[in-house]
């Protein structure tokens, strides 16, 4: 059994296979996932798992050089936005419109669907390098 905190086998495999600049999205329960993009559906019920919990676990495994979020998160979900800033720390954040973020998910290696019911809780993480 793995010793690290991420134990979802498919998600672990996807992260391990990501190269520099590849992207992966973490989505709330309502974000449309484009056809042809892998869906890793973790949603069990309303707010399980939460968006921020899922982000913390993924950040424990993935080297991230940039995070992309929708500008709408700041206004529509300010508490989540404030916590997100703390979690991301020094990772640069790019803000785009929600519509642009949805288009950008077409290029992601996968979209991780959570049970999150808070609006605009979506993020795209761009893989960095550890050296």
Curated annotation (Swiss-Prot):
Subcellular location: Cytoplasm
Pathway named in the protein's UniProt entry: Carbohydrate metabolism; D-ribose degradation; D-ribose 5-phosphate from beta-D-ribopyranose: step 1/2
Top-level EC class as recorded in UniProt: isomerase
GO biological process: D-ribose catabolic process
Keyword Nucleotide-binding applies: no
A single Gene Ontology CC term: cytosol
Residues spanning the signal sequence: none
Enzyme Commission identifier(s): 5.4.99.62
Active site: 20 (proton donor)
Chain sites annotated for binding substrate: 28, 98, 120-122
A Pfam family annotated for this UniProt entry: RbsD_FucU
Catalytic activity of the protein: beta-D-ribopyranose = beta-D-ribofuranose
Predominant subcellular localization, coarse grouping: cytoplasm
Keywords: Carbohydrate metabolism, Cytoplasm, Isomerase
A molecular function GO annotation: D-ribose pyranase activity
Keyword Oxidoreductase: no
Function (record text): Catalyzes the interconversion of beta-pyran and beta-furan forms of D-ribose.
Family, per entry: Belongs to the RbsD / FucU family. RbsD subfamily.
Subunit-structure text: Homodecamer.
Descriptive protein name: D-ribose pyranase
Species this protein is from: Coprothermobacter proteolyticus (strain ATCC 35245 / DSM 5265 / OCM 4 / BT)
Record gene name: rbsD
